[in-house]
């Protein structure tokens, strides 16, 4: 179709499968009381019915059918084809609250390693005239079993609106609309910006041209993103400075709307599709002295710290974004101080990301000794990774075996089954492969066969899994199966992302689209008082 190679343009299923919501993911930050077995539980809930197809699905004695409104984020139907107000309200209510906003703290300075002051609430920091701050904002996905937004991420429009007022007068903003409904392109968008081979944006349902993503700002289920906003307080400021931040959703951006609903000749199309508020927060900071106000947050303080750290962790790593990883670690220490073992586990995640394996092992040991201890399956997963990195393959295998057999009574009672997580299956194959290399003769042959079986199980769940195909190629070479090895090498070439080809497309788009170039940076700071407004062709 694309005259290039196999590419996944949209993938709801793995997003759900590898999440905590499904009960199959081993590495989620949060887990629900009960696993959600499929999409229907959320999007097609049971409703009582006397329809001839009604059944007693849940054993309650009540006949029901699955609701075929298919609750989701299609808020454009009423405007476009005149569906009922009731159906629009059902969709609106379904997505409200799905992206929580938390104005968590400030940094006194212009970059991400400036001194942090927070969390905000119940008290607020006092700002000083003339200082520059970063407003640290957390976006947390709530009540969903897949990445937000998923679906048609080329045209779904989710953005963050920020309004800063000083005694009622606007002094900073982001995410505003122009008179035609186009969103300021320098805003933070919760989307994926996907490019064609020549560096043009995929924005006309031209999936056959998908080549590479410039960035992907979608947020996994039970995870968070941390967004930095820069603000300079006026030198003569006094009184109260108020920051209001909202996450907003519109089914189609203006560019896409104008394609299938073109404006009259000589006119600019106006995007009048409804905008739904997904989440919001507001804080009033005193200037110089006094007390501010903050909206009440019902979420516990440890969770707010945890979400702040998760957002930073997802950005952090080696090199340019190491500062985000350091801040994430500091946040997880706060979670520990507030009495939750999640802080130790997430600190271990950060240490693994930084390559500090001994520190990760220490954090996991602390998590296991904590009262109450961390989730045992989480300890086993990250413990196995640490042991494998240290060459302790037998210890890693013991943990992985407990995981793949879900030997945790609490997990089983909640409907969890980790045997379908391809990351776990690949890890089992990798460890068995490593153990086999230590053997000779029949012992090695048996070990290679065992490793082979685990990678084959991965392909049952995910036939395009590049890790499994690569290892199966190596295994079959050692086992003397040259033809099978060649076949898996071919699949690996077919499914592996083409890193060498992406640079030209990305470079072309970054040059042509300054706002997207900024949003694709390793560390992104959005200026709330930006003076220039270079807008690329084709407003959104």
Predicted features along the sequence, with ranges:
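Primarily the internal scaffold of c-type cytochrome electron-transfer domains
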Residues: 1-221, 227-301, 307, 504
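Residue-level recognition of tetratricopeptide repeat
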Residues: 301, 340-342, 374-376, 410, ...
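Alpha-solenoid helical repeat scaffolds
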Residues: 306, 345-348, 376-382, 413-419, ...
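Structural marker of alpha-solenoid helical repeat scaffolds
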Residues: 338, 370-372, 406, 417, ...
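TPR/TPR-like (Sel1-like) alpha-helical repeat modules
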Residues: 401-408, 456, 466, 470-501
């Amino acid at each position: 179709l694309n005259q290039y190679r196999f590419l996944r343009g949209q993938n709801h299923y793995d997003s759900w499968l590898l999440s905590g919501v499904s009960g199959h993911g081993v590495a989620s930050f949060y887990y629900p009381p009960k696993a959600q077995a499929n999409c229907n539980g959320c999007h097609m809930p049971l409703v009582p019915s006397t329809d001839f197809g009604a059944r007693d699905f849940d054993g309650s004695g009540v006949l029901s059918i699955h609701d075929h409104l298919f609750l989701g984020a299609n808020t454009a139907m009423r405007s476009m084809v005149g569906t009922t107000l009731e159906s629009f309200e059902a969709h609106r209510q379904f997505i409200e609250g799905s992206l929580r906003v938390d104005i968590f703290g400030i940094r006194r300075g212009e970059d991400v390693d400036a001194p942090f002051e927070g969390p905000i609430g119940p008290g607020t920091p006092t700002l000083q005239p003339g200082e520059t701050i970063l407003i640290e904002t957390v976006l947390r996905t709530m009540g969903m079993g897949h990445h937000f937004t998923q679906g048609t991420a080329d045209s779904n429009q989710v953005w963050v609106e920020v309004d800063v007022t000083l005694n009622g007068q606007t002094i900073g903003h982001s995410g505003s609309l122009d008179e035609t409904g186009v969103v300021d392109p320098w805003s933070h968008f919760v989307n994926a910006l996907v490019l064609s081979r020549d560096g043009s944006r995929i924005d006309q349902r031209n999936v056959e041209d998908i080549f590479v993503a410039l960035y992907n700002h979608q947020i996994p289920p039970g995870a968070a993103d941390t967004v930095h906003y820069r603000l300079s307080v006026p030198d003569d400021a006094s009184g109260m400075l108020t920051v209001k931040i909202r996450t907003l959703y519109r089914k189609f951006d203006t560019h896409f709307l104008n394609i299938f609903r073109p404006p009259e000749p000589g006119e600019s199309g106006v995007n009048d599709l409804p905008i739904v508020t997904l989440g919001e927060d507001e804080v009033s900071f005193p200037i110089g002295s006094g007390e501010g106000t903050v909206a009440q947050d019902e979420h516990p303080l440890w969770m707010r710290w945890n979400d702040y750290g998760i957002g930073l962790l997802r950005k952090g790593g080696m090199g340019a974004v190491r500062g985000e990883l350091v801040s994430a670690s500091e946040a997880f220490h706060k979670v520990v101080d507030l009495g939750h073992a999640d802080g130790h586990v997430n600190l271990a995640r950060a240490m693994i990301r930084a390559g500090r394996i001994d520190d990760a092992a220490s954090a996991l040991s602390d998590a296991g000794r904590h009262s109450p201890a961390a989730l045992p399956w989480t300890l086993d997963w990250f413990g196995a990774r640490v042991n494998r990195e240290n060459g302790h393959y037998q210890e890693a295998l013991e943990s992985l075996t407990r995981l793949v057999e879900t030997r945790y009574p609490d997990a089983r009672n909640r409907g969890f089954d980790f045997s379908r997580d391809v990351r776990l299956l690949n890890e089992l194959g990798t460890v068995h492969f490593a153990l086999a290399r230590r053997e000779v003769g029949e012992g090695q042959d048996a070990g290679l066969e065992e490793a082979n079986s685990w990678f084959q199980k991965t392909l049952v769940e995910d036939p395009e899994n590049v890790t499994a195909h690569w290892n199966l190629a190596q295994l079959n070479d050692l086992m003397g199966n040259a033809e099978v090895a060649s076949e898996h090498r071919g699949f690996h070439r077919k499914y592996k992302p083409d890193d060498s080809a992406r640079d030209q497309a990305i470079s072309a788009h970054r040059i042509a689209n300054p706002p997207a170039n900024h949003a694709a940076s390793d560390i992104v700071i959005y200026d709330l008082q930006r003076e220039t407004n270079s807008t690329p062709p084709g407003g959104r």
